[in-house]
Amino acid sequence: MQKHNIEVLKTARYFSLGTLNSQTKKIIFALHGYAQTADDFLESLKSLEDKETYIVAPEGLSRFYWKDFISNPVASWMTKLDREDDIKDSLRYLNQVFKEVTNNVDLKNIDVEFFGFSQGAATMSRW
């Protein structure tokens, strides 16, 4: 048996909290932990929301059912199977999210912060 890998285009999602505009002074990129989703994670960060802060929560590219097939799907950033490929794909995705969010923003007057929880922290440290 031979293993083959190919790169494919994948649709991924991320969530944001706040409004990115001329009042924005801080952008926070927040990466969820293992078996979470970006939207649920962002809910836990609502206390950081104010008119000067824009929070971006990318979601891990690998989804799965945490307990059974009737539960809501959750996500992870990597598994031990083809781990290096998962890491490479995640970094490519995070770079694209960063570029999309900051494309029309003058970052000279904006603090950009990075926050990761659990597996999100490990992913963040590689980014």
Question: For each predicted feature, which ranges?
Answer:
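Gly/Ala-rich beta-loop-alpha elbow adjacent to hydrolase catalytic centers
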Residues: F115-G120, M124
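Class I SAM-dependent methyltransferase Rossmann-like catalytic core
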Residues: Q2-H4
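Active-site signature of alpha/beta-hydrolase-fold catalytic machinery across serine-
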Residues: E43, R126-W127
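Serine-hydrolase catalytic machinery in alpha/beta-hydrolase-like enzymes
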Residues: V8-L107
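Residue in the alpha/beta-hydrolase core beta-strand immediately N-terminal to the catalytic nucleophile
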Residues: D111-E113
